[in-house]
């Protein structure tokens, strides 16, 4: 039986600055607010756990005008309770304290507590990524933008040795997007490239199948969210008839009854974003159900800083993934934290000799 302890919780806010105009289906991003959760024993800051709560505008259920006040109130409650210091127990305690409707706070609190439990070294879970420096294969992301900007990114990612590219589509003329995909396939470096596209729900139900037929010629691995969320019957029909495997992404956010979603649509893949789904415990439940139903999956970060990306990478590593994951590179922001996370040759790795910058 582990002993319960009282801990001190607080947070720091930083506005991260994008290095470029980050085009998404919900507009162009220039900045991103993150809240780093800090936990330690009262009067002892030698051992500190850090987590990240950073809701995304237009995607996170907890992107709220009073988010900072909500976070502050929950941390006051966390200060006034005792914590049973065991991994599974901590996850259950966070679930009991933080409502399902606040997924980024759940994720941040889970991460901070597990980091503290493991000595405040940024080790969240037992995993080969942190413990042995084992790399995780990732996809190179091609952001939405002008055709010229997307072409520039394609050449850069191929030059960096990525073996899997994911291109966001639905922002520019579809014919131009097809030209870009054709260009990728014509490159010598892309002969065996795994190619994914993410439509972010951009296709109408009426046009979706026609566009999928045009995309199939490029040897697609999968397409994420071809139509908008909430159209389960139409999405199920696409999952049955599409020449390209369907992956659900936004469709999973805010869903308590996981089995209902998956049985209704029966997709080929799931895209799992822990900070949007409710953290480690919720993500593990999605994976357990997906594997029971024979549905593939991969993990994806959601523009987190190095604190969040580190936690998601470690969670991913516990499953020893073979598919390329959608983990970020940590190079999105001018003022991200310095960290041991490095990306080279299409893999993310934890440099065990690297140094962490302390959040401030």
What spans do the regions from the language model cover?
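Short, Φ-rich (hydrophobic/aromatic) sequence segments
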Residues: 113, 314-315, 322-323
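Short helix/strand-capping turn motifs
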Residues: 320-331
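N-terminal capping/lid subdomain adjacent to the active-site entrance of alpha/beta enzymes
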Residues: 2-195, 200-202, 209, 214-217, ...
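Alpha-helix C-terminal capping segments
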Residues: 117, 317-318
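Short, solvent-exposed secondary-structure boundary motifs
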Residues: 28, 329-334
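Conserved beta-strand termini and adjacent loop/short-helix elements that scaffold enzyme active sites
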Residues: 12-14, 141, 249, 300, ...
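Catalytic core of soluble alpha/beta enzymes
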Residues: 172-302, 306-310, 314-316, 333-344
